[in-house]
Each structure stands twice: as C-alpha cells, then as structure tokens.
Regions:
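Active-site loop/oxyanion-hole signature of alpha/beta-hydrolase fold enzymes
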Residues: 94-132, 148, 174
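Conserved HGGG/HGGXW glycine-rich cap/lid loop of the alpha/beta-hydrolase fold
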Residues: 46-99
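Catalytic active-site module of serine/aspartate enzymes centered on a nucleophile-bearing elbow/loop
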Residues: 307-354
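N-terminal cap/lid segment of alpha/beta-hydrolase-fold proteins
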Residues: 30-50
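Alpha/beta-hydrolase
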Residues: 171-301
Length: 354
C-alpha cells in the first residue's frame, strides 16, 4: 500500500495521528512478490464497468477484504494468502482505484458496498461473509453488515475510521490550542492539487506533487510491483477516485455509517487499534497519548455494538497494522471465523502476543 504524505484525512483532524511503523525498518528481502499485483486479477462486470476482484482459496464463510483510502488489493498481501489456506478470500480495488474502472458516482461507503456486493454476486462468491476493513474500509464494512445483515457473520476492523472522528478531532484540537497556543498557528502542508497535477494523464515523476499525491510504498514490496503500483496511483483515474473518497469521507460516508444499526447482536466484531506511538516533534507525549485514547474510545464504541465485540490494542504498530503486524490481523480473522462457526464462544479481551 502507499502512504500519502499529504492526506485529506490528516488535514481535517484524523485522530489516528501515528507514524507507520513500517517506515522504521525494511525487511532483508521482499515479502510481497506475487505477480498478481502487476495487473488485474479478474475484471468483473457490474453493469457497464468492471471491478478488479482478487479471489483465492476455498471454504466458507468467505472472507472479504476492503482496503483503506486510496489503497488496493495489495493492502492485504501479507494477510490474504494465510486466510486463503482454509477459506475463500476476496480483495478488490474500489471504483477508479488500482485496476478497476472509474465510476460516475461519488466515492462513498454506500456506493462502494453496492459495487462489491454486485461483484460478489456476479463472481458467484456466495455468503456467508466475514468482512475485514482497514482504515476507511472499516466504515464501509459496517455499512455492508448493516445492509446485508443476513449475509454477514462477523467483522474485523483494522484501525478503522469512524464517522465521528472529525467532530471529535475538532473538539480535541480546540482544547489542545488552549493548552498549547502554538498549535493553533502550526503550519499545514499545502494542498498539492493532485487531480490538477495529473491532468496530462498521470502525475509526472519530477512533479513536486508526485510524492505527496502518490505516497510511499511499504519497503517489503518487490520493486517491479512497487513501480507498477506507483504508475497506477499516479494516473488521473486514481487521483480523481481518491479525491472523491476524500471529499465524501467526513460528510456523505460518515452520515451513511452513522445511519447504520448500533446493535449487531452476538456477531463477532474484533477491532484492532494501534498502540500509542512516540509524539511528533513539537507535541508533548501526554498530548499524543490523549489523542490515541480518543481513537481507542471510538473503536471501543464499535466493539460495544456486539456482545462478542472486543478491541485489541496492537503494540509495535502504526496505522498500517496489516503491514506492521499481519500476524495479529490473521489471528483476529481466524478467531472471528471460529466464533462465527461455533468453534469458539467469546473473543479474547486482549491479544497474548506482545
């Protein structure tokens, strides 16, 4: 996956405010080498446009992966293969991202859910489904589970976005500015105008907007896959899709998620939340820890929507837990599957592995 240096979610006060742990060290050899990420896995026609759907494995329930904002199937490269040993698994590129065709509809959680549900039907991937969502994908899987409650047996939400994170961030920022007035005058990175920068068809590599708009790749990805991913991300199609997702995140998508049910009965819901990280320069550690606690509380609220809900705090991780600690994500999925199929009764309160 890529990490954009200038992201709209950060600009509007995203509470996760944590460096990605994968930037700290690179593996000795590439961990992501599957050539499936060099092109479309399967282009599924969902009514005049195609969605890139990558399915592998056998076994029910099927596990459906939804990546974070501006991300694609590669977000699950360290998780999906392990789960596919025992279950059917599918990841996909949302409309306009990766190898999926662009849509003339806005990039909202409900529209994304409509797309992937149609694709699963066309591809004959039958329910029941266990849904796994990272970041903004965490809101989408909740919309899916609400809309198709009879088809969903569980959710694993990996450092998921929350419909109220922006409003809570604004309240937090007001308190922080009163405590530390310099924060009210901190520099905000300039908008790189990504869509404009890609108007020729793609953002040129020598453009000042290239790195802010395209981002950085997890260092464990094979170079050929990295190059292809960057080329796809730099394309005008991808930049328009990401801009649409950003524009709708705190408004339409948040409202769609807010309108979903607050009681999922005994459906397993396992939330994964990054542990506190060192504070960025100029921010007291106590303030950074409070930010993380607000993020944790948002996740606790989602876990409380089920009698089988739990929030695991994941040490040694940033926002990209799917790369930083893929083994934890795999354990959470396997536990949710075990509960959903009656092989386990309750989720563990915490994860045993440090």
């Amino acid at each position: 996956m890529t990490k954009r240096k200038v992201a709209a979610l950060a600009a509007i006060g995203c509470l996760m405010m944590a460096a990605t742990a994968w930037a700290d060290e690179a593996p000795a050899r590439p961990l992501v080498t599957d050539p499936v990420y060099l092109g479309p896995a399967r282009l599924v026609d969902i009514g005049g446009r195609r969605l890139n759907l990558y399915c592998r494995g056998r076994g029910s329930p099927a596990v459906i992966f939804d990546a974070g904002a501006n991300d694609t199937t590669i977000a699950w490269a360290l998780v999906q293969p392990a789960i596919s040993k025992t279950h059917m698994t599918c990841s996909y590129d949302r409309a306009g991202l990766g190898f999926s065709d662009a849509s003339n509809r806005p990039g909202t959680s409900a529209n994304d859910v409509d797309d992937i549900h149609k694709a699963l039907q066309v591809a004959h991937i039958k329910p029941p489904y266990l849904l796994v969502g990272h970041s903004a994908g965490g809101m989408a899987v909740r919309v899916f589970a609400d809309r198709y409650r009879d088809e969903v047996v569980g959710m694993v939400i990996v450092d998921g976005s929350h419909e109220d994170q922006v409003s809570r961030a604004k309240a937090r920022e007001a308190l922080e500015a009163a405590e530390m007035p310099a924060l009210a005058h901190r520099d905000v990175p300039p908008d790189p105008h990504c869509v404009d920068a890609a108007k020729s068809g793609a953002i040129p590599k020598d453009s000042p907007a290239y790195t802010p708009c395209v981002g950085e790749m997890y260092p464990g990805v094979d170079q050929a896959i990295t190059d292809k991913t960057f080329a796809v991300m730099a394309a005008l199609k991808s930049q328009k899709a990401h801009a649409s997702e950003d524009a709708n995140f705190a408004t339409v998508s948040a409202d769609e998620t807010r309108a979903t049910r607050r009681d999922f009965g005994d459906m397993p819901i396992i939330m994964l939340t990054h542990a506190p990280r060192p504070a960025p320069k100029g921010i007291p550690q106590a303030m950074q820890d409070r930010r993380t606690m607000v993020w944790e509380q948002l996740h606790n609220e989602v876990a409380a929507m089920s009698t089988h809900g739990v929030n695991w705090i994941v040490p040694r991780s940033g926002h990209t837990i799917n790369y930083d600690r893929p083994e934890i994500v795999i354990d959470a999925i396997n536990l949710a599957l075990a509960i959903a199929t009656g092989q386990a009764s309750q989720p563990k309160v915490t994860h045993d592995q440090p």
